[in-house]
């Protein structure tokens, strides 16, 4: 149950500090990577919780995060509450992306219901998502208020054939990020100081992945991708156009440079396989910077929104890491290899910029 809005940042700060002390990071992650199976992992991170396989374990991790952030929402009001509410709305967007994939693979929506996340403040939304929706247009109606429906329809209609889930999901992400940037700009100056770097880092990671994966892997053109640019970040529209015009993934990464990463991967010859390697390396380096910024906001944001959103960012990374570990344990990957896949990654070669 969500508590009444009190804007009690002192109490909320105490809550997130207590939770952060139990977060799976550092040596704790090293230990989890050495576990033998999913049962041991579940006992370590979800003690006393029964789950049915890897997918159910992962779903419970995400649902737990949603429940936690929903409780924190009850301690905020005004622009802080609006901002955290939009962070939670990201999970509604992710629900729609699950259904987009079901459209592409012709899997009945009802079979996807187990993968959808339920938001406590909108208990009926998940059921609505999985019932009777048979088109992209119908899915738009189920997106959270704040998503620009007209923009979504225009972009989708311009690139309807062939149906490309990557592009549809990118349109959803870009539209979500536009609103996220706008809500960040409404925060008080003392809060923007801590929250803005986190938001811009995530959005510019999105920009870079549009080029590295959208162009060099999925074959989308700069004309397809340039309209997805989100204004107000460190990668301007002009710079984004230069990144999209790069002849290979390594050049595109170098053109993004320190706007997204503290380091860039060593330049490699451009072919399909190595382009994917560049994309994976850049994504890891981008999220490594995100973790650094989130920790800085959490530790130095005092009893302000920066601390709350820094913590929320760290929790998202924690969940992503635990999901990665669960997948690797199912596949029988070695502990060293598992650790190399986590955020922040270890043992990566890079050229500093």
Briefly describe each language-model feature range.
Residues 1-353:
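N-terminal domain-start signal
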């Amino acid at each position: 149950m969500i508590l009444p809005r009190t804007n009690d940042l002192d109490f909320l700060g105490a809550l997130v500090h207590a939770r952060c002390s139990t977060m799976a990071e550092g040596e704790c992650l090293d230990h989890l990577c050495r576990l033998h199976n999913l049962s041991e992992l579940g006992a370590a991170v979800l003690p006393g919780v029964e789950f049915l396989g890897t997918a159910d374990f992962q779903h419970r991790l995400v649902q737990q995060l949603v429940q936690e952030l929903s409780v924190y929402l009850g301690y905020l009001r005004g622009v802080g509450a609006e901002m955290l509410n939009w962070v939670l709305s990201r999970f509604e967007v992710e629900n729609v992306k699950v259904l987009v994939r079901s459209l592409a693979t012709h899997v009945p929506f009802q079979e996807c219901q187990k993968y959808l996340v339920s938001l406590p403040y909108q208990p009926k939304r998940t059921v609505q998502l999985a019932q009777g929706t048979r088109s992209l247009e119908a899915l738009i109606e189920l997106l959270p208020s704040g998503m620009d429906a007209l923009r979504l329809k225009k972009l989708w209609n311009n690139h309807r054939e062939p149906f490309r889930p990557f592009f549809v999901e990118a349109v959803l992400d870009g539209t979500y990020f536009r609103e996220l940037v706008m809500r960040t700009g409404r925060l008080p100056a003392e809060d923007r100081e801590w929250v803005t770097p986190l938001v811009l880092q995530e959005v510019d990671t999105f920009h870079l992945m549009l080029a590295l994966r959208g162009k060099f892997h999925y074959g989308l053109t700069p004309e397809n991708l340039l309209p997805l640019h989100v204004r107000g970040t460190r990668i301007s529209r002009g710079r984004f156009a230069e990144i999209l015009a790069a002849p290979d993934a390594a050049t595109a990464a170098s053109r993004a440079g320190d706007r997204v990463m503290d380091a860039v991967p060593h330049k490699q010859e451009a072919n399909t396989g190595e382009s994917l390697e560049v994309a994976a390396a850049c994504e890891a380096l981008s999220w490594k910077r995100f973790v650094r910024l989130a920790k800085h906001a959490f530790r130095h944001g005092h009893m302000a929104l920066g601390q709350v959103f820094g913590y929320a960012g760290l929790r998202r990374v924690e969940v992503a890491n635990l999901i990665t570990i669960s997948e690797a344990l199912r596949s029988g990957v070695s502990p060293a290899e598992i650790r190399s896949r986590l955020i922040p990654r270890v043992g990566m070669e890079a050229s500093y910029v």
